[in-house]
Amino acid sequence: MSDYILLYILFAPFAGAIALIFASNRQPMLVRGIAAVSAGISLVASLYLFYAYDPVKGGFQFIHKFEWSRQLGIALHLGVDGIGTPLVLASSILLFAGIFVSWHIKDRTKEFYIWLLILAAATIGVFMSLDLFFLYFFYEMSVIPMYLLLGMWGSHTKKYLEMTDQEGLKQRDSVGFIFNFAANSKEYAAMKLVLFLSAWAVVALMGILLIYRYSGLNTFDILQLREHAKLMNIPV
């Protein structure tokens, strides 16, 4: 099991999301069950990872590397260290707990759990990635689910819900309310979060490309870049 433990943790939520695509919205308990099982698999594997990690040995362990583009130096390179291991476990716990906390959701249940599973998997992928390309890929993958979860299933502030039009009618009774990006709406909060994340993502992308360009190694591999930095007497 330990040979593929990171793959179980990472791809169980993805597999659950794919399975939910083919599930029927008319069977909400089946939808919740699929989400819970996939999250449970990821949690059990994360617990195993947490206790199997050797803190005495330290460093990155349970490493997997799958070449994606040798020409560009891109690979699905996974591994965890003493910091990444508890973060992966925490993400799996939050996903599993989130499934049951949101058990009462009846509005577009299937879509909610699909995006929740994708968000969790992307977050876990960030903590596992030892390749800058995939680290950035998983980071960006988490942005869309966050926007949709906040914008569609989030909650407006009390002040926003009490807004009325010129005739004194509740604005939430109008169609325009759905697309209102006023300062107290959930859509505004979601959009603001995405803008902040995207702005910093551009800065991160520029940094990654500069590292790739000036390292001279033609690779996004974090471990290789770290060793190269040590040889160049660059603090890492």
Regions found by a protein language model. Give the residues of each.
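N-terminal cofactor/phosphate-binding cores enriched in small/glycine residues
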Residues: 10, 14, 24-25
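Structural signature of hydrophobic alpha-helical transmembrane segments
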Residues: 2-12, 80-91, 133-145, 236
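Alpha-helical multi-pass transmembrane bundles of energy-transducing inner-membrane proteins
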Residues: 26-28, 111, 115-118, 122-235
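Small-residue faces within membrane-embedded alpha-helices
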Residues: 11, 35, 92-95, 120, ...
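Small-residue hotspots
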Residues: 17, 46, 207, 235-236
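Transmembrane helix-loop-helix hairpins at membrane boundaries of multipass inner-membrane proteins
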Residues: 1-5, 19-100, 104-114, 218-227
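Hydrophobic, membrane-inserted alpha-helices
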Residues: 15-17, 95-96, 118-124
